């Protein structure tokens, strides 16, 4: 029973749950960026350089022979993947930069001294009265 309770404690920790949520959101974000690059960014770039569809850019290393498929080096898809990576990396960089700035602002904010309670004020007055009585000749 010890292993199961340890696993439960591990799995329920906030860090593990936060990490799982981050992975799921990251996977969804990756799909959005891939669609953005493939469907929005690359078509205008292809038009600018002569109507080229980057997904179709490839070099055939060995032509198809009979039932054997062709050996193709699909460098256009690789270019799209590089652009995907750059956009995702930039978005993550900007997110981390914002989080770090917020953390810095929290750390820099001065902490005000606590306001004394009524009891503390009364104790201070009693102390001052006792000091005054002790200093009288």
UniProtKB/Swiss-Prot annotation:
Primary localisation category: membrane
Any single Gene Ontology cellular-component annotation: plasma membrane
Transmembrane segments: 9-29, 32-52, 54-74, 79-99
Subcellular location, record wording: Cell inner membrane
InterPro entries the record matches: Mechanosensitive_channel_CS, MS_channel, MSC/AndL, MscL_channel
Keyword Mitochondrion: no
Domain of life: Bacteria
Membrane topology annotation: Multi-pass membrane protein
One term of GO molecular function: mechanosensitive monoatomic ion channel activity
Keywords: Cell inner membrane, Cell membrane, Ion channel, Ion transport, Membrane, Transmembrane, Transmembrane helix, Transport
Family: Belongs to the MscL family.
Assembly information from the UniProt record: Homopentamer.
Function description: Channel that opens in response to stretch forces in the membrane lipid bilayer. May participate in the regulation of osmotic pressure changes within the cell.
The protein's name: Large-conductance mechanosensitive channel
Organism (species): Pseudomonas fluorescens (strain ATCC BAA-477 / NRRL B-23932 / Pf-5)
């Amino acid at each position: 029973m010890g292993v199961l309770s340890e696993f439960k404690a591990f799995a329920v920790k906030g860090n593990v749950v936060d990490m799982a949520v981050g992975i799921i959101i990251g996977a969804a974000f990756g799909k959005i960026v891939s669609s953005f690059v493939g469907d929005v960014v690359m078509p205008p770039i292809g038009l600018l350089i002569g109507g080229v569809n980057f997904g179709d850019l490839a070099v055939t290393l060995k032509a198809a022979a009979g039932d054997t498929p062709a050996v193709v080096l699909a460098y256009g898809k690789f270019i799209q993947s590089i652009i995907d990576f750059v956009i995702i990396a930039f978005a993550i960089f900007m997110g981390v930069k914002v989080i770090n700035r917020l953390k810095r602002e929290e750390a820099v904010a001065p902490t005000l001294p606590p306001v004394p309670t009524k009891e503390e004020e009364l104790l201070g007055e009693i102390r001052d009265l006792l000091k005054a009585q002790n200093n009288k000749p």
